Amino acid sequence: MKSTALVYRRRFFVLALMISCAASAIYAQNEPILVPDVVDYAKLVPILPDAPQAWTADKPEGSTEDVGGFRITNVHRDYHKGEGDKAPTAAISILDSVANPDYVSATTAAWNNNSETSEGYSKSVTIDGNPGFEAFEKESKHATLWVMVANRYFLQIELQNQDPRELQEWIKRVDLKKLATIK
């Protein structure tokens, strides 16, 4: 008899939980979704640094667009040192992801994996208290650093034909504290 009562209690608990979840979902459908708005790209362009000595920089690019029901802001700048296929290059991009917190959570959670092989490495890093992820492909000499700033800005630095240690020099050129205050 005790076991039957226990089964009924469990069924009641599961049923109550299901009804509660369904009621919450129905109630939530009637609530407006409050999504913070992304900043205008013009506020982020000044964060992109000038070219270091002996380098040239392309004109910064940026946009704020409506994409599938939410807005997205992105800025980007390319840097070159010399000419030709083997010349060192760098690119810096900033994406305002405040309108998509699920994307932020999923992406930064994936940064917890570290690996090293004969082909390169990937590792989680912390830059001035900001979580990040660094990857390097030896054969192509392609290095990338992603940093999440203020839980909203994805900062990406890509280097081609450079030592991956140069990522640390490039990140110093970006004012992360100033970026964190832009809203």
PLM region descriptions:
Residues 29-34, 81, 115-183:
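A short, solvent-exposed beta-edge/loop patch
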Residues 31-140:
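Short, solvent-exposed recognition patches
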Residues 13-23:
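Bacterial N-terminal signal peptides
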Residues 24-28:
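Sec/Tat signal peptide C-region and signal peptidase I cleavage site
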Residues 2-14:
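Bacterial N-terminal signal peptides that target proteins for export
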Residues 14, 74-76, 89, 144, ...:
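Broad gene-expression machinery/nucleic-acid interaction feature
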